[in-house]
Design a protein with these regions (language model features):
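The feature captures the beta-strand-to-loop junction immediately N-terminal to the Walker
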Residues: 38-40
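Short helical segment in ABC ATPase nucleotide-binding domains corresponding to the A-loop/adjacent helical element
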Residues: 91-99, 109, 217
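A short, proline-enriched helix->beta-strand linker immediately N-terminal to the Walker B motif
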Residues: 147-151
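Conserved ABC ATPase "signature" region
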Residues: 99, 106-124, 176
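Conserved ABC ATPase signature
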Residues: 128-132, 136
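Helix-to-loop junction immediately C-terminal to a conserved catalytic motif
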Residues: 53
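Conserved ABC transporter NBD signature motif
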Residues: 61-71
Length: 262
């Protein structure tokens, strides 16, 4: 499944209070691509994902899907906040989307348990979310998104609230699951290292109103792991991205706008 954003813009409010958050966003994903989206705080990254997910209407432009995904929905969105249901146990949380699609009980539980095994949580299947750590709850959200079998997976800083060690583990787990299933992924992050480690390309956004500054191919072979971050190839690319995006971060920090991330 491929996705194209054609000239997406978004304005919140009206008249003198109108705020342009996104302006002329145009890009295409490739089949099975992992696309990292990187930009300063408040540039509209989360707004863009919500438009792609159909949760927000763009002020202008359109989102176009092409290709077939008969086994599942068009997209699934994983937020920074895990968004799991506290009254359901772990297995029922993962199986929820399949239940809504009418998948028979045994089939949905078998599929959900398989993904819980992949994220190391099968032994917690009957536990309630409050019994688990924040990192474990985010693993539940990731397992639920993949088992739902979306054509395109949208991830809005899913590791942003985690401690550094847990973040590294989940990055590695995500890479392994993605490698097995090759879903098209659009992954929003503030972290340059994360964008390079995970992505096939890195889409850089300007400060608000968010525009595409450039799209940089990563060009580092797979499979990847944390050790690649010490290679000259990785460090050179990291500096290349930082040199491109630094001025946008400085604009955001200086308060050239009063935007916030919607």
């Amino acid at each position: 499944m491929r996705l194209e954003c054609r000239c997406i813009s978004k304005i919140f409010g009206e008249g003198k209070k109108a705020t342009r958050t996104l302006d002329d966003i145009c890009f295409e994903t490739r089949e099975g691509e992992f696309l990292s989206v990187l930009g300063p705080s408040g540039c509209g990254k989360s707004t863009l994902l919500r438009i792609i997910a159909g949760l927000l209407e763009p002020t202008g432009g359109e989102v176009i899907y092409s290709g077939n995904n008969p086994a599942g929905p068009l997209n699934a969105l994983v937020f920074q906040e895990h968004g799991i249901f506290p009254w359901m146990n772990v297995l029922d949380n993962v199986a929820f989307g399949l239940e809504m699609r009418g998948v028979p009980r045994k089939e949905r539980y078998d599929q959900s348990l398989d993904f819980l095994k992949r994220v190391g949580l099968a032994q917690y299947a009957t536990r309630n979310p409050h019994e688990l750590s924040v990192g474990m709850r985010q693993r539940i959200a990731i397992a639920r998104a993949f088992v739902h079998n979306p054509a395109i997976l949208l991830m809005d800083e899913p590791f942003g609230a985690l401690d550094a060690q847990t973040r590294l583990i989940l990055q590695d787990e995500l890479l392994k699951i993605w490698s097995d299933h090759k879903k098209t992924v659009i992954f929003v992050t503030h972290d340059i290292d994360e964008a390079i480690l995970l992505g096939d390309r890195v889409l850089l956004m300007t400060s608000v109103p968010g525009r595409i500054k450039e799209v940089i191919p990563v060009g580092i072979g797979r499979p990847r792991d944390l050790r690649m971050e010490n290679t000259q190839e990785f460090l050179t690319l990291k500096m290349r991205i930082w040199e491109s995006i630094r001025s946008e971060v400085e604009k955001s920090m200086m308060g050239d706008n009063d935007e916030r991330e919607y």
